[in-house]
Design a protein with these regions (language model features):
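Short alpha-helix in the Rossmann-fold core of NAD(P)-dependent oxidoreductases
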Residues: 1-10, 24, 47-54
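Conserved beta-strand elements of beta-rich interaction domains across eukaryotes
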Residues: 11, 30-31, 79-82
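NAD(P)H-dependent oxidoreductase Rossmann-fold/reductase module
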Residues: 36-210
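Amphipathic alpha-helical dimer-interface segment in Rossmann-like NAD(P)H-dependent oxidoreductases
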Residues: 1-18, 63-67
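Active-site loop of short-chain dehydrogenase/reductase
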Residues: 13-35, 70-73
Length: 210
Protein backbone atom coordinates (compact mmCIF):
# COMPACT_ATOMS: atom_id res chain seq x y z
CA UNK A 1 0.00 0.00 0.00
CA UNK A 2 2.79 2.42 0.87
CA UNK A 3 4.51 2.11 -2.50
CA UNK A 4 1.20 2.65 -4.32
CA UNK A 5 0.58 5.80 -2.30
CA UNK A 6 4.12 6.94 -3.08
CA UNK A 7 3.62 6.31 -6.82
CA UNK A 8 0.25 8.08 -6.87
CA UNK A 9 1.68 11.16 -5.17
CA UNK A 10 4.60 11.39 -7.61
CA UNK A 11 2.75 10.69 -10.86
CA UNK A 12 1.67 14.31 -11.48
CA UNK A 13 5.35 15.34 -11.46
CA UNK A 14 6.45 12.33 -13.52
CA UNK A 15 3.79 13.04 -16.16
CA UNK A 16 5.14 16.57 -16.55
CA UNK A 17 8.75 15.43 -16.95
CA UNK A 18 10.39 16.07 -20.31
CA UNK A 19 12.42 12.86 -20.16
CA UNK A 20 12.46 9.45 -18.47
CA UNK A 21 8.87 9.21 -17.33
CA UNK A 22 9.31 5.90 -15.56
CA UNK A 23 8.52 4.13 -12.28
CA UNK A 24 10.67 1.24 -11.00
CA UNK A 25 9.16 -0.99 -8.31
CA UNK A 26 11.76 -3.38 -6.89
CA UNK A 27 10.16 -6.52 -5.51
CA UNK A 28 9.56 -10.07 -6.80
CA UNK A 29 8.80 -9.69 -10.49
CA UNK A 30 8.49 -12.68 -12.86
CA UNK A 31 7.05 -14.77 -10.02
CA UNK A 32 3.42 -13.73 -10.41
CA UNK A 33 0.69 -16.25 -9.65
CA UNK A 34 -2.73 -16.53 -8.04
CA UNK A 35 -4.19 -13.74 -5.89
CA UNK A 36 -6.23 -14.67 -2.82
CA UNK A 37 -8.59 -11.80 -2.12
CA UNK A 38 -9.83 -13.40 1.12
CA UNK A 39 -6.33 -13.00 2.58
CA UNK A 40 -5.13 -9.86 0.83
CA UNK A 41 -2.37 -9.11 3.36
CA UNK A 42 -1.11 -12.68 3.09
CA UNK A 43 -1.09 -13.40 6.81
CA UNK A 44 -2.25 -17.01 6.46
CA UNK A 45 -0.53 -18.19 3.27
CA UNK A 46 2.39 -20.52 2.79
CA UNK A 47 5.61 -18.86 1.68
CA UNK A 48 5.43 -19.63 -2.05
CA UNK A 49 1.73 -18.81 -2.32
CA UNK A 50 2.41 -15.50 -0.57
CA UNK A 51 5.21 -14.76 -3.02
CA UNK A 52 3.01 -15.38 -6.08
CA UNK A 53 0.17 -13.38 -4.53
CA UNK A 54 2.31 -10.35 -3.66
CA UNK A 55 4.06 -10.34 -7.04
CA UNK A 56 0.75 -10.27 -8.92
CA UNK A 57 -0.68 -7.52 -6.72
CA UNK A 58 2.37 -5.39 -7.47
CA UNK A 59 2.24 -5.98 -11.23
CA UNK A 60 -1.51 -5.47 -11.58
CA UNK A 61 -1.33 -2.24 -9.58
CA UNK A 62 1.34 -0.96 -11.98
CA UNK A 63 -0.86 -1.91 -14.93
CA UNK A 64 -3.67 0.13 -13.38
CA UNK A 65 -1.37 3.12 -12.93
CA UNK A 66 -0.22 2.82 -16.55
CA UNK A 67 -3.80 2.75 -17.81
CA UNK A 68 -4.35 6.14 -16.15
CA UNK A 69 -0.88 7.43 -17.09
CA UNK A 70 -0.07 6.03 -20.56
CA UNK A 71 2.97 8.26 -21.08
CA UNK A 72 4.71 6.71 -18.07
CA UNK A 73 6.35 3.28 -18.20
CA UNK A 74 6.28 0.99 -15.17
CA UNK A 75 8.84 -1.69 -14.34
CA UNK A 76 8.34 -4.30 -11.63
CA UNK A 77 11.67 -6.03 -11.22
CA UNK A 78 13.36 -8.71 -9.18
CA UNK A 79 16.83 -7.49 -8.14
CA UNK A 80 18.42 -10.89 -7.73
CA UNK A 81 20.04 -12.23 -4.58
CA UNK A 82 21.61 -9.24 -2.88
CA UNK A 83 22.54 -8.37 0.69
CA UNK A 84 19.64 -6.06 1.45
CA UNK A 85 18.40 -6.98 4.92
CA UNK A 86 14.96 -7.80 3.52
CA UNK A 87 14.44 -10.62 6.03
CA UNK A 88 15.15 -8.50 9.11
CA UNK A 89 12.41 -8.80 11.71
CA UNK A 90 10.97 -11.97 10.18
CA UNK A 91 10.31 -15.11 12.21
CA UNK A 92 9.21 -18.71 11.77
CA UNK A 93 11.09 -21.98 11.49
CA UNK A 94 11.60 -21.90 7.71
CA UNK A 95 12.75 -18.28 7.54
CA UNK A 96 15.02 -18.68 10.56
CA UNK A 97 16.70 -21.68 8.92
CA UNK A 98 16.96 -19.82 5.61
CA UNK A 99 18.59 -16.80 7.26
CA UNK A 100 21.13 -19.08 8.95
CA UNK A 101 22.06 -20.65 5.60
CA UNK A 102 22.35 -17.23 3.96
CA UNK A 103 24.61 -15.93 6.74
CA UNK A 104 26.99 -18.84 6.16
CA UNK A 105 26.92 -19.16 2.38
CA UNK A 106 25.53 -15.82 1.20
CA UNK A 107 28.87 -14.50 -0.03
CA UNK A 108 28.98 -17.34 -2.58
CA UNK A 109 25.88 -16.23 -4.47
CA UNK A 110 25.17 -12.59 -3.57
CA UNK A 111 25.16 -10.19 -6.50
CA UNK A 112 27.63 -7.37 -5.72
CA UNK A 113 25.83 -4.19 -4.66
CA UNK A 114 27.58 -2.14 -7.36
CA UNK A 115 26.45 -4.52 -10.10
CA UNK A 116 22.88 -4.47 -8.76
CA UNK A 117 23.01 -0.69 -8.85
CA UNK A 118 24.29 -0.67 -12.43
CA UNK A 119 21.46 -2.96 -13.52
CA UNK A 120 18.87 -0.69 -11.95
CA UNK A 121 20.35 2.36 -13.65
CA UNK A 122 19.90 0.47 -16.93
CA UNK A 123 16.27 -0.33 -16.07
CA UNK A 124 15.70 3.31 -15.23
CA UNK A 125 17.28 4.83 -18.33
CA UNK A 126 17.09 2.44 -21.29
CA UNK A 127 14.49 2.83 -24.04
CA UNK A 128 14.13 -0.95 -23.85
CA UNK A 129 11.52 -0.39 -21.12
CA UNK A 130 9.70 2.57 -22.67
CA UNK A 131 6.04 3.54 -22.50
CA UNK A 132 5.75 2.65 -26.20
CA UNK A 133 7.75 2.39 -29.41
CA UNK A 134 7.12 6.10 -30.09
CA UNK A 135 7.80 7.25 -26.55
CA UNK A 136 9.50 10.66 -26.81
CA UNK A 137 10.86 10.36 -23.27
CA UNK A 138 12.15 6.81 -23.61
CA UNK A 139 15.68 7.46 -22.34
CA UNK A 140 18.89 6.06 -23.84
CA UNK A 141 18.00 4.93 -27.39
CA UNK A 142 18.32 1.30 -28.41
CA UNK A 143 20.63 2.33 -31.24
CA UNK A 144 23.55 2.58 -28.78
CA UNK A 145 23.45 -1.23 -28.48
CA UNK A 146 22.36 -2.91 -31.73
CA UNK A 147 21.70 -6.25 -30.01
CA UNK A 148 19.01 -4.71 -27.77
CA UNK A 149 15.31 -4.59 -28.61
CA UNK A 150 12.15 -3.43 -26.89
CA UNK A 151 11.21 -5.59 -23.92
CA UNK A 152 8.01 -7.60 -23.90
CA UNK A 153 5.38 -6.15 -21.59
CA UNK A 154 3.20 -8.01 -19.10
CA UNK A 155 0.53 -8.35 -21.80
CA UNK A 156 2.95 -10.21 -24.08
CA UNK A 157 3.38 -7.28 -26.48
CA UNK A 158 6.60 -5.42 -27.22
CA UNK A 159 7.02 -1.97 -25.66
CA UNK A 160 3.57 -2.01 -24.08
CA UNK A 161 4.55 0.09 -21.07
CA UNK A 162 4.38 -2.28 -18.08
CA UNK A 163 7.14 -4.83 -17.51
CA UNK A 164 7.84 -7.73 -15.16
CA UNK A 165 11.62 -8.10 -15.29
CA UNK A 166 14.04 -10.60 -13.76
CA UNK A 167 17.53 -9.97 -12.38
CA UNK A 168 19.03 -10.31 -15.87
CA UNK A 169 16.78 -7.61 -17.35
CA UNK A 170 14.57 -10.09 -19.22
CA UNK A 171 10.77 -10.16 -19.33
CA UNK A 172 8.61 -12.73 -17.56
CA UNK A 173 7.80 -15.87 -19.50
CA UNK A 174 4.58 -17.13 -21.03
CA UNK A 175 3.52 -18.87 -17.81
CA UNK A 176 3.45 -15.55 -15.96
CA UNK A 177 1.75 -13.79 -18.88
CA UNK A 178 -0.98 -16.44 -18.83
CA UNK A 179 -1.40 -16.12 -15.06
CA UNK A 180 -1.78 -12.35 -15.34
CA UNK A 181 -4.20 -12.69 -18.26
CA UNK A 182 -6.35 -15.01 -16.15
CA UNK A 183 -6.37 -12.52 -13.28
CA UNK A 184 -7.34 -9.67 -15.59
CA UNK A 185 -10.17 -11.71 -17.12
CA UNK A 186 -11.66 -12.10 -13.64
CA UNK A 187 -11.57 -8.36 -12.94
CA UNK A 188 -8.76 -8.76 -10.44
CA UNK A 189 -6.99 -5.52 -11.38
CA UNK A 190 -9.92 -3.41 -10.22
CA UNK A 191 -10.43 -5.56 -7.12
CA UNK A 192 -6.77 -5.11 -6.18
CA UNK A 193 -6.85 -1.35 -6.63
CA UNK A 194 -10.15 -1.00 -4.77
CA UNK A 195 -8.69 -2.91 -1.82
CA UNK A 196 -5.45 -0.91 -1.83
CA UNK A 197 -7.27 2.43 -2.04
CA UNK A 198 -9.70 1.45 0.71
CA UNK A 199 -6.82 0.48 3.00
CA UNK A 200 -5.04 3.77 2.26
CA UNK A 201 -8.19 5.79 2.93
CA UNK A 202 -8.66 4.00 6.26
CA UNK A 203 -5.06 4.70 7.24
CA UNK A 204 -5.36 8.38 6.32
CA UNK A 205 -8.65 8.69 8.21
CA UNK A 206 -7.08 7.14 11.31
CA UNK A 207 -4.14 9.55 11.12
CA UNK A 208 -6.49 12.54 10.72
CA UNK A 209 -8.52 11.54 13.79
CA UNK A 210 -5.35 11.09 15.82
Amino acid sequence: NARNRFITNLLPLINNATSLRRVISVFIATLEGEIQMDDFQGWHMKLMANRDHAASITTLSLESHHKDNPKVSFVHNFPGVIKSGITRGTSGVVLTALKAVVRIFGSLFYMPAEEAGDRHVFLSTSARYSAGEKDEAAGVPLSVAPDLSFARGTDGKLASGVYSINASGESAGVKVEDALASLRSRGMTQKVMDTINTDIEKALATKTKA
